């Protein structure tokens, strides 16, 4: 598996527990690991439920809706490919289904533009609590990443 895109961006390197997350993302689905016994959602994926200790899990389909819980604006100096995109916001999003589940990703300015440049959302538009929607950007035939589209309202 490649470690970088043709543009020099780092690709995710999933472990065994996280591979299903990336597999579902390739299909355009946001799925989160859940305990098959007690139902607790967990992210990042891990082998054992932190609530009941069960090793049985399932991957539940999420709505993709969430809220901006926090963000940071990345500035140079960074790796060369990232420096060319900076400054750009990186979001921490809490999912609508469970606010304890938070995912990191870059933002896009429209659900219709999953491949928009990372700096497409001006940092001045960002507000904690702003609604976002998951979108999926294909980076390589093997890797699709979850990004977050800033929603109006």
Question: Residue spans of the language-model regions?
Answer:
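A short, structured loop/turn motif at beta-sheet edges
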Residues: 60-65, 96-98
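Short functional micro-motifs and their immediate structural scaffolds
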Residues: 43, 56-58
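Residues located in well-ordered beta-strands
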Residues: 34, 65-67, 92, 106, ...
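Glycine-rich active-site loops that engage anionic ligands at enzyme catalytic sites
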Residues: 69-123
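Short, cysteine/histidine-rich loop/knuckle motifs that typically chelate Zn2+
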Residues: 34-37, 48-54
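Well-ordered alpha/beta subsegment
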Residues: 3, 100, 104-153
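A broadly conserved sequence feature marking short terminus-proximal activation segments
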Residues: 1-30, 143
């Amino acid at each position: 598996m490649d470690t970088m895109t043709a543009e020099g961006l780092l690709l995710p390197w999933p472990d065994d527990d996280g591979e299903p997350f990336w597999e579902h993302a390739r299909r355009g689905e946001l799925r989160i690991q859940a305990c098959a016994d007690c139902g607790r959602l967990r992210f990042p994926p891990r082998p054992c439920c932190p609530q009941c200790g069960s090793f049985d899990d399932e991957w539940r389909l999420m709505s993709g809706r969430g809220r901006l819980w926090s963000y940071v604006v990345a500035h140079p100096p960074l790796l060369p490919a990232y420096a060319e995109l900076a400054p750009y916001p990186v979001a921490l999003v809490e999912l609508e289904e469970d606010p304890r589940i938070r995912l990191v990703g870059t933002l896009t300015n429209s659900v219709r533009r999953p491949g928009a440049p990372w700096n497409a959302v001006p940092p001045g538009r960002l507000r904690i609590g702003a609604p976002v929607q998951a979108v999926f950007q294909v980076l390589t035939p093997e890797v699709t990443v979850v990004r977050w589209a800033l929603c109006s309202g």
